[in-house]
Amino acid sequence: MKISFISDLHTKHWQWEVANKEQLDNFHNSDVIVFSGDMSSRGYEHEVKNFLEWFNNLNKSAVKIFIAGNHDFFFDTEWYGRTRLGVDRHESHNEIIQKDIEKLLCVYPDLIYLNDSGFEYKGVKFWGSPITPWFHDWAFNRLDDEIGSHWEVIPDDIDILITHGPPFGIGDLLHPKFQRLNEDKNVGCPHLLKEIDRVKPIIHAFGHIHEGWGTYKQDNTLFINASCLNQDYKPINPPITIELDLLTKTTKII
């Protein structure tokens, strides 16, 4: 099974496709395409629609899976309802936003949206979550004292874990210009790293930290930071494509 991974396009999907046109053969011929969040810049519905239209029209034979990221406010019912509607959290407002999300997703029935949920294809089990550690109240942020219990719900038997943010120490090193004195240069989630040690997925795909783009192997897990934009938001990072052997559950980067 050929799987391509992308992330963090921030409305620049068209520019990215043009900039990487000579490196997209495997991408356009993949069996599965996985997007790890941050399709938008400011989380507006029109930004999300524009991306989903592009994503939906990629390789029609491919299964396309996506999650939201911390920029994708539209998908966060609590955040969007609380801030855009100018009200405190209230169930009725959350339901209104949820209906808007469902209405939009119905336009693209072939796209698989994961929000702390799973999907199985040809025996390969995917599980996706948009949650990231707290950072100035962006979408899907969780405080340190609650994010640990969140990751504990990741099933034990998944093959491919998709999150927006990285685990601590893997693909999470900030570019020097973003590093601050007396603050950790690695900004991934230690609680997520702990649960990865429990779950032991074949692949963990993420983005969020653009400068961490690339692949990392630790024990038997292949970690993929698939950020398509670099730290300067230039769309220069190509997709990362792997071949997954369905019998041995081993991977090869192609």
Predicted features and spans:
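N-terminal active-site segment of His-dependent metallophosphoesterases
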Residues: 1-66, 72-78, 153-157, 162
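Beta-strand-turn-beta hairpins that frame and shape the catalytic cleft
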Residues: 1-4, 111, 118-128, 156, ...
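Active-site neighborhood of phospho(di)ester-bond hydrolases with catalytic His/Asp-centered motifs
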Residues: 5-7, 33-38, 63-70, 114-115, ...
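Conserved catalytic scaffold of divalent metal-dependent phosphoesterases
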Residues: 9-11, 42, 57, 66-187, ...
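Short, glycine/charged-enriched secondary-structure capping and boundary segments
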Residues: 18-21, 48-51, 79-83, 141, ...
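Aromatic-residue hotspot detector
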Residues: 27-28, 35, 51, 60, ...
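Binuclear metal-dependent phosphoesterase catalytic core
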Residues: 120-122, 191-199, 203, 210-254
